[in-house]
Structures are given as structure tokens and as C-alpha cells.
């Protein structure tokens, strides 16, 4: 039987269609999932860094407000002015409270160094301990403020908000560590706050001295946290360098 002249043409067209579909499928499968979204690439790691930086910015604002409130509210302003006066006179106890913080940060790792990845992992762990170091003290300050007399709601609410945002930031940092370094072993070591005994004492003077220490340290550390988060985001994600 003689085949119609159109059959080879039909078979060739069908073959071309199959091959074309296969090529399209291979091309589609090669596109990263994030590029296939209409809104563009969504990177959970970058978004978590953004969340952490937003929380750190909120902490910066709250720390400013808390610091100002303690110096202007009748509940604490008089004693804080005395602390500053004693600080100038180099009163040893007040100087310790006004200048020493129980948690510190080293310099971030240099970009592009030979062991940059290992240094970045180590520094991320250090930042976790740095942020977590004040959660315990803040928790105790909230407890003490709740039982002290004539505590303004503005002061109490600020401490609560700072504690909540500290916990939120800590969770973001923990997630980043497990995402970037899934096999990393993390030992969280939050140093003891030496002014806890002052906070737990009976005298208002010593309780406020503990808050003097906390407010100064929280006020200063929020600047550092924002800076180091930007550095880590750049080194880990390559974004916003």
C-alpha cells in the first residue's frame, strides 16, 4: 500500500511538537523556584535577616525611649541625676554601673579572609549570646517593677516591649544559624548579670542603680546589634553590602 504523501509531514510535525515540549519542560525545570514567582525571588534567609534588622530597629527606638523616660519621669529622674553626678565624681559603684556591661562583642570577621566562613559562624554564635545576655535581666526587671510602688506604666511597658523584642530577635538569629550552619553545635552561654543582687535588694536606690546599668547598656548595644546584623547579612547572603 502506498502511504499518502501527507503522512511523513504529519509524523515530522508530531515529532517536532514532542521535542519542543520536552525542551520547554527542561527549561522550566531548570528555573529556580523563586524566579518562577510573579513577585520575584523570595529568600527565607534574606527575609529572616530583614526581620531581625527590623526588630533591632524597634529595639533601638524602645531603648531610646526607655533611657529618656528614666531621666524625665518623677519616679526615677532625681536618682538618675544623682547617679550622673556621682559618675563625674568617680564613685566606684556608680561608675561600674554606668560604664560596665556584662555582655560584649568582638569585631566582626573581615570580608574575604581565608577562614571567613568559620569566623562568620563563630561571630553569629557570639551575637546570639550577646542578644540573649539581657533577656534574663529584663525578665527580672519586669518582675521587680510590677511589685514596686508608684511605677509609671510608661516605664513598665517599655521594659516589657524590649524583653519581647529581644526574644523575637534571638529566635531569628537561632533560625539563621541552623539554616546556614545546619551541623553547627551551639552552646548558649549567657553571662550572669552582676547587678541582679542590686535589683533584688530592698532599697529603691539600689534597684534604680541596677536599672541605671541596664538602661545604659541596652541603649549602647542596640547600635552595635544593627551594625553587626548588616555585616552578617552581607557576608552570609551577599545582599546589601
UniProtKB/Swiss-Prot annotation:
Protein keywords: Disulfide bond, Glycoprotein, Hormone, Secreted, Signal
Xref: InterPro entries: 4_helix_cytokine-like_core (IPR009079), Somatotropin/Prolactin (IPR001400)
Annotated tissue distribution: Detected only in placenta. Localized to spongiotrophoblasts and trophoblast giant cells of the placenta.
UniProt key word Signal: yes
Primary residence: secreted
Keyword Transferase among record annotations: no
Name recorded for this polypeptide: Prolactin-8A9
Source organism (scientific name): Mus musculus
Amino acid at each position: 500500500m502506498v502511504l499518502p504523501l501527507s503522512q511523513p509531514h504529519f509524523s515530522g510535525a508530531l515529532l517536532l511538537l514532542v521535542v519542543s515540549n520536552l525542551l520547554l519542560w527542561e527549561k522550566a525545570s531548570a528555573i529556580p523556584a523563586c524566579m518562577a514567582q510573579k513577585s520575584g525571588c523570595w529568600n527565607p534567609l534574606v527575609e529572616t535577616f530583614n526581620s531581625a534588622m527590623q526588630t533591632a530597629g524597634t529595639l533601638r527606638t524602645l531603648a531610646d525611649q526607655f533611657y529618656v523616660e528614666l531621666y524625665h519621669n518623677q519616679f526615677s529622674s532625681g536618682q538618675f541625676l544623682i547617679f550622673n553626678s556621682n559618675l563625674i565624681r568617680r564613685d566606684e559603684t556608680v561608675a561600674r554601673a554606668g560604664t560596665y556591661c556584662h555582655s560584649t562583642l568582638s569585631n566582626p570577621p573581615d570580608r574575604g579572609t581565608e577562614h571567613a566562613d568559620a569566623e562568620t559562624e563563630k561571630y553569629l554564635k557570639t551575637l546570639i549570646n550577646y542578644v540573649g545576655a539581657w533577656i534574663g535581666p529584663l525578665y527580672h526587671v519586669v518582675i521587680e517593677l510590677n511589685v514596686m510602688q508608684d511605677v509609671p506604666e510608661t516605664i513598665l511597658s517599655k521594659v516589657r516591649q524590649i524583653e519581647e523584642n529581644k526574644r523575637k530577635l534571638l529566635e531569628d538569629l537561632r533560625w539563621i544559624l541552623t539554616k546556614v550552619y545546619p551541623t553547627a553545635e551551639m552552646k548558649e552561654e549567657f553571662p550572669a548579670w552582676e547587678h541582679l543582687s542590686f535589683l533584688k535588694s530592698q532599697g529603691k536606690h539600689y534597684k534604680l542603680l541596677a536599672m541605671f546599668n541596664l538602661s545604659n547598656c541596652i541603649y549602647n548595644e542596640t547600635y552595635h546589634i544593627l551594625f553587626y546584623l548588616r555585616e552578617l547579612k552581607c557576608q552570609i547572603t551577599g545582599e546589601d553590602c
